[in-house]
Amino acid sequence: MSYYAFEGLIPVVHPTAFVHPSAVLIGYVIVGAGVYIGPLASLRGDYGRLIVQAGANIQDGCIMHGYCDTDTIVGENGHIGHGAILHGCVIGRDALVGMNSVIMDGAVIGEESIVAAMSFVKAGFHGEKRQLLMGTPARAVRSVSDDELHWKRLNTKEYQDLVGRCHASLHETQPLRQMEENRPRLQGTTDVTPKR
């Protein structure tokens, strides 16, 4: 793991969290219990404070940053998809930010909301609970359905379970020269399938 102190501030990571060795945490970063931080994520607390609350996940290649005197917060059980950028914003409890989305300064994503992949949420946007947001700029198109929220929660549970799986078995290795016979497929811990 790459942890860096900045002007005397050292990242704080709960012992039950998993931070991938290629992720970078700088300065005023607080990572809560059971959090998953994926490969190549950058959490740069060299201006504002970054808080990732319990059970949330920050996936591969995500960036968190913010201005001085601001907090960038991912609420409890928040789900931040691959390549998303969060800058000086607040992601509500149990909300999902889709892959490669950008959430700008002062924006607030409501609890149990879903931001569709590749959306751009403008600075100062204030969402309500359980909105489906999409587009560039993003706008609320309807409420999140019970089925969609269930699907989101199954995906988040997969990442919460992945924390323990990574602690138990992830380690650096050398590649095999050829695939062994009868190689098993990896299995998830829920019955979640891709949304179509």
Swiss-Prot record:
Gene: caiE
Alphabetized GO MF terms: transferase activity
Protein name per Swiss-Prot or TrEMBL: Carnitine operon protein CaiE
SUPFAM superfamilies: Trimeric LpxA-like enzymes
Pathway note: Amine and polyamine metabolism; carnitine metabolism
Protein source organism: Shigella dysenteriae serotype 1 (strain Sd197)
Origin: domain of life: Bacteria
Similarity remark: Belongs to the transferase hexapeptide repeat family.
Biased composition annotated in UniProt, kind: Polar residues: 187-196
Function: Overproduction of CaiE stimulates the activity of CaiB and CaiD.
Region (Disordered): 173-196
A Pfam family recorded for this sequence: Hexapep
Keyword field: Repeat, Transferase
Gene Ontology terms: biological process: carnitine metabolic process
UniProt-listed CDD domains: LbH_paaY_like
